C-alpha cells in the first residue's frame, strides 16, 4: 500500500506529535528515576493512575490542541475524569499517557506513551514510545512500521506449536465478570497449551505486547477489556509490519470494541481465536 494522505497536513500532524512524545518521554524518565510517585486507584486496585500519567496527557493534549485547532482528543485520564468520548470524522488523537502504569509504579521498565491519529474514523498513524529503553515505534498507513527508524516485520510463523503468545490473566475484567473471569482466562490459556503453544509472555502493557508482535519477537496476542487508547497506536504498527489485527472472534477489528487479537499471520490468528471463550463489552463509542 502506498501512503495517500487524506488530509493535506497529515504529515505535519505526525511529525509534531513525535516531537511532543519525545518531550513527554523526558518527563516520564525523570519520574521513573524518582524514589516514589503519588498513586491513586480508579475502577479497582489493578487500575492505577499517577501524577505522571496526568502530566503527560496534559502536555500532549495542550501541545496538540494549541497547534491544531479543531482536533478532537480521546485520552485515558480525561475519560477517567468524566470526559465523553466523541468519535467523529474530525482528526482525533487517541492517547494513553503511560500504558503499563502498574509497571511504572513498580519500576518495571516496560511502559509506553501511546498516541494514535484517526481521521474520518480511520487509524492513520501510531506512535508507541518506551522512554525507559528509548525505543520508539512508528507507523503510518501505507508507509510501513519502524523502530527507532529501522523497518520491522511481524513473524511469518503460521503454527501455534512454534509460537510464543502474549497474554495475561486480565484481572481488570473481574470488575465486570466477577470470579467467572478467572475460569474464562484460565480456560483460554489451557486451550492454548493443549494446542501446543511454545510459551506465554506478558509484558504488562497492551501496547508493548502488540509491538512485540509487530517486530516478530512474539507471534500473537489477545486481550479483553482493553480501551481504545491501549490499542489505537499499536494496531497500525502491527498491520504496517505485515501482521493482522482482528476482533478475537475473527471479525474485523473495531478500535472501540474493548477487545483485540493480533498475530504475525492470519493462519496463526485463526488458530488462536479457536482457543478462546469469547466475551463482549459495551462499545466505547
From Swiss-Prot:
Residues bound to Mg(2+) 1: 76, 96, 98
Protein name from the UniProt record: Inositol monophosphatase ttx-7
Enzyme class: hydrolase
Gene: ttx-7
Localization: Cytoplasm
Binding site for Mg(2+) 2: 96, 99, 230
Species assigned in the record: Caenorhabditis elegans
One MF annotation (Gene Ontology) recorded for this entry: manganese ion binding
Residues the record lists as binding substrate: 76, 98-101, 204-206, 223, 230
Keywords: Cytoplasm, Hydrolase, Lithium, Magnesium, Metal-binding
Pathway: Polyol metabolism; myo-inositol biosynthesis; myo-inositol from D-glucose 6-phosphate: step 2/2
Phenotype upon gene inactivation: Worms lacking ttx-7 display defects in thermotaxis behavior and localization of synaptic proteins in RIA neurons yet appear morphologically normal.
Reaction it catalyzes: a myo-inositol phosphate + H2O = myo-inositol + phosphate; alpha-D-galactose 1-phosphate + H2O = D-galactose + phosphate
